[in-house]
A protein has these predicted regions:
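Re-entrant/interfacial helical elements at transmembrane boundaries that shape
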Residues: 61, 101, 145-155
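Cytoplasmic/organellar membrane-interface segments at the starts of transmembrane helices
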Residues: 121-126, 172, 180-215
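Structural signature of hydrophobic alpha-helical transmembrane segments
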Residues: 24-39, 87-95
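Helix-coil boundary and interhelical linker segments in multi-pass alpha-helical membrane proteins
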Residues: 15-28, 68-86, 155-163
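Membrane-interfacial loop-to-helix junctions in multi-pass transporters
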Residues: 30-38, 77, 119-129, 158-163, ...
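Single conserved hydrophobic/aromatic residue that forms the stacking wall/gate
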Residues: 1-13
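Internal transmembrane alpha-helices of multipass membrane proteins
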Residues: 4-5, 28-75
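Transmembrane alpha-helix interface/packing and boundary motifs in multi-pass membrane proteins
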Residues: 42-48, 132-142
Length: 215
């Protein structure tokens, strides 16, 4: 019993010592704020250069996870709320996008964004699910991803990191480009190449339906 009480006291004191108030008072996490901002921008720029859809989504994941680290490093109440919320919103949105990328490969054997010409009309359900997931990741209202980014931006302003708020806005613009480009190519461009579609397993479509209905 004595050991249990001592352990609880140590945990409680540790949380108090290294909690958000400690980070705010000492500004010991400010370096992590700028490191997260650099990762957000660098990953977004690299994602734009990737023609492989899964590689593009992978670098997008690095960028989005840096949002969470940024919120924790800012350590304000709004930023922490945004970071916590972003864990959920990003998980739902990105799982949907990766499922769609997998479904496109299974049905059409296409991996590259540049090869998606005209596929939006041939795979409407998959592209519809992809669109919902992309809009949530970008943070377009009223999708749930908009709330987490809103709290992160407000948390940055609360900590007087105006430049960080601007970086988050620029990152969202980059998100628009590299996440919506596959949709634009799929519906606005045509290809002379014959693509033989293969029926995807029903489990793939059930998974897609479950993911974007939650988003």
């Amino acid at each position: 019993l004595w050991y249990r009480r001592q352990r609880q006291m140590c945990i409680r004191d540790s949380v108090y010592i290294v909690g958000p108030e400690f980070l705010l008072q000492t500004k010991s996490s400010d370096w992590l704020v700028w490191l997260a901002c650099f990762t957000i921008m660098a990953s977004s720029i690299i994602a734009i250069t990737k023609d492989d859809l899964k590689a593009r989504l992978a670098y997008s994941t690095i960028s989005q996870l840096s949002y969470i680290i940024l919120g924790a490093a800012l350590a304000s109440s709004l930023a922490l709320k945004g970071a916590s919320f972003h864990i959920i919103t990003h998980a739902l949105g990105k799982i949907t996008l990766f499922f769609c990328a997998g479904a496109i490969y299974v049905t059409a054997h296409i991996k590259k964004v540049s090869e998606l010409k005209g596929m939006g009309f041939k795979l409407p359900l998959i592209f519809f699910a992809y669109t919902l997931g992309a809009l949530s990741i970008i943070g377009v209202p009223p999708f749930i991803g908009s709330w987490s980014k809103f709290y992160l931006i407000m948390g940055s302003i609360e900590r007087e990191f105006i430049v960080v708020a601007i970086i988050l806005g620029i990152s969202s613009l980059l998100n628009i480009y590299y996440l919506l480009q596959p949709i634009v190519i799929g519906f606005t461009q045509t290809s002379r190449r014959e693509v033989k579609l293969i029926k995807a397993p029903l489990t793939v479509f059930y998974s897609l339906n479950g993911n974007f209905s939650d988003a």
